[in-house]
Amino acid sequence: MTVWRGSIFIPVRVCHVVSLRTDPLRRRWLVWTVLAIVFLLVNLYRLSSAVLADRLMAGFNTTGAGLGTLHASFFYIYALMQLPTGILADRAGPRKTATAGAIVFNVGAIGFALAQTYHVAFLSRALIGLGGAVIFISTLRFCANWFRADEFATMNGLTIAIAGLGGIMATTPLALAANAFGWRPTMFGLGVVGLLFAGVVWLLARDSPESAGLEPIEDVETGTTLTLEEVLQNLRAVLAERETWVISLMLFCSTGVLITLLGLWGVPYVVQTQGVSVTTASYYTLLGSFGLLVGPPTFGWVADRFETRTGLIVGGGIVYVAGFGVLTLVPSPHQGIVALIYFTSGATLGAFTLSYAVIKDRHATAASGVSTATVNGAAFLGAAVFPTAMGYALDTYWTGETVAGSRVYTEFGYQVAFGIATAAIVVALCCGLWLHWKLPDG
C-alpha cells in the first residue's frame, strides 16, 4: 500500500502530472480552497454592517443600539450553533455539514437583500449566522483528517486568514459595489454565487482520503465515524477541562472585540472623529482585515516551526491591549496611528487564534470537531455581545444630530465604547498569561 508523505506546501511532481482528484496531497488543497471560498463569503457577510451602517440605519429607521442588535443577530445564532456544529462535524462529517450550511447561509443573504422591514432583516441575518456557523469548524475538521498534527496550526492560521480576506472584501470593495449597484443587488448576487459553491463543496469534498478512495497520508490520524454516544463522551471530556473555559473566555473577549471593530463601529468611528467619507473610512477596516490576513498564518507557521503556542499568545496580547488603550485614552488620534492600530489589532488576533491548536492538541483527532467548536462558540458569543454593549454606550453620548439618517456620537462616547473593548482585551491577556503558566511552551 502506498502511503503519501504530507507537506504543508503543494507538492511538485517532476516525472509526471498527477490529477488533482487522485493525488491526496493535491486533492486536500483543492477541497480546502473550495471550503475557503465558502468561508470567505461567511466573513464578507458578517462584517458587511460596517460599510453599510448608514444605509442600514436609514433603510430600517433604527438607532445605534438597534443597528448593533441587527449586526449581532448573526453572532447570537452563530455562537449557539457551535456545539451542535462540533457534533455534526464529528458525527456526519465535514462534507455534509459544510454543504448544508452553505445552502442555508446564502439563502439568508438573499433574504436579507430582499428585506423591507427591520424584523425580516433581523431574521435573514440570523439565518446567515445559522448556516455560516458550521463552515469554519467543518473546515478545521477537514484539515484534521487530511493534514498532519504538526501542520494543523499553520492550516488553522491559513483558514483564519481567509476571514481576513473576507473582511477585506467587506470594506472598500463592498462599499464601491454598493455605491455602483446598490447594497441590495450586491448582496443578492453574492447569495447566488454562494449557492453555486455549495454545490461544488458537495461534488468535491470528502471527509478523509479513504472516503475519497485514496491512499492514506503518512502521519495523518484520520478520525473515524463516531456514534452519538462517543461524540457526547468527547464533549463531556472537553467541557471538564479548566483550559477549555479559560480559552473560551479569552476568545470571547479578543475575537468579539475585533469583529465588532471591523464589522460595525470601526467605520463610523473614523467617519465621525476624522471627518472622512464612509468609503475612505473603509480603508482603515481594510487594513485591519489585511492584518487578519497576514497575522494568523504567520503566527501559525512560527508556532509549528518552533513548537511554541502560549508565549506567542501573551506577546500578541500585549500589543493588542496597547493599541486599544490609545483609542480609549486619546480623543482623536492621528489618522496614521488609527490605521496602525487597526492593522496590528487584526494581526495580533492571530496570536489568540493559536488557542484552537492548543485545544485541538489536547484531544484526539476524532474529538477535534467538538473541541474547536466549543471555544469557537465563545468567540462568536463575544461578537454578539460587544456590538450592542458598545452601541448602548454610544447612544448615551448621542449629540442629537443625524446625518443621512445615521446618528452622530461624541468623541467621548467613542472613548467610553473603546474603554469597554480595552477592558475585555485585558481580560483576554490575563487568560493568555494563565495558559502560559499552566501550559508552558516546550
Can you name each region flagged by the protein language model?
Residues Y45, N61, G93, L114-V120, ...:
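Helix-breaking motifs and short loop linkers at transmembrane-helix boundaries and internal kinks
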Residues G108, H119-L127, G336-T344:
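Paired small-residue
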Residues F122-L165:
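Cytoplasmic helix-loop-helix junction between adjacent transmembrane helices
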Residues L80-H119:
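Conserved MFS/SLC helix-loop-helix module at the cytosolic interface between two early adjacent transmembrane helices
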Residues L83-G93, P296-T308:
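Helix-to-loop junctions at the C-terminal end of transmembrane segments
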Residues L158-A212:
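Helix-loop-helix hairpin linking two adjacent transmembrane segments in secondary transporters
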Residues S19-P24, R206-S248, Q272:
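Juxtamembrane intracellular "pre-TM" segments in multi-pass secondary transporters
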Residues S49-A50, L239-P297, P387-G391:
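Extracytoplasmic gate region of multi-pass secondary transporters
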